[in-house]
């Protein structure tokens, strides 16, 4: 089978390797679609993420879907949860599997991901796709799950004023969910104009170009000189964190979703302290696939429009180049494109 492995910073190579052999409780999935995530780009450009460094050639890719053959020869299409918690530790037992200390995660550390034609993965992580969802949408359920978890952390309610700082795919999904939750005001910021256009199309009521925090004054005015009740930072940049804190009203919640390249998140402490802000950090997602599937199936969230570029696995270099340049919204690689 074809496999794309990361050997070091910027060093991706196509290999031919044997098909995977499933272990106990695993099934072989023929990978249909892999959406490239910002964390994949961290691995690609920095050979690591969040303190983790590549130690041996790694297969990236954790936002994916595919199909399996059932015992009767039929085909079952599945979205695949990349996270495999132990299920036994304190955090798993208390309902926080995303915080499991021995959690396995596709395309991270020692666990190879989905940029290959086939992957053996635990049955518990396979979610059947309804007929109304295609495999591209199936791959997008993972980032939607992260956005759902972020919005859960923010406790967005009817009439809430929301700020979304960073309008990549996660930020744009947060915009859609905030609208769905009944937010009265959704302010979105980003450096890229095509992302701001998408934010407006997905339900943002006001959009502003991100310019070193200067936009916080406009946000303050737009919010009626009150600031936003919930601020979501989804850019992975300190400038966005600073703007989120500056734009939040007293007593607000700030949810940090982005992953900073330099492993540091900073903001003005006095501003956050005097406002009595609650700062929450979003760690991936937890148990969100069933909700994500229902939201897309019922047409309440649009993930299909986020996918702007699709490539076969042989064109992996071009796919990563487009994603790294942020030329579109979401890039998808299709290892079994012809099937």
Per-region residue spans from a language model:
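C-terminal hydrophobic helical "lid"/dimerization subdomain
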Residues: 1-3, 242-246, 286, 290-339
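N-terminal glycine-rich cofactor-binding segment
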Residues: 5-21, 38-69, 79, 97-112
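Glycine-rich beta-strand-centered segment in the early N-terminal region that forms part
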Residues: 20-34, 48-93, 125, 130-132
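Cysteine-cluster motifs in flexible loop/terminal segments that predominantly coordinate metals
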Residues: 37-38, 82-127
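Mid-domain Rossmann-like dinucleotide-binding core that forms the NAD(H)/NADP(H) cofactor-binding site
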Residues: 77, 124, 133-213, 217
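Glycine-rich cofactor phosphate-binding loops and adjacent beta1-alpha1 units
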Residues: 154, 197, 202-278, 317
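The conserved SAM/SAH-binding core of class I Rossmann-like methyltransferase domains
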Residues: 189, 257, 282
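Residues in the short beta-alpha loop(s) of Rossmann-like NAD(P)-binding domains
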Residues: 191-192, 260, 285
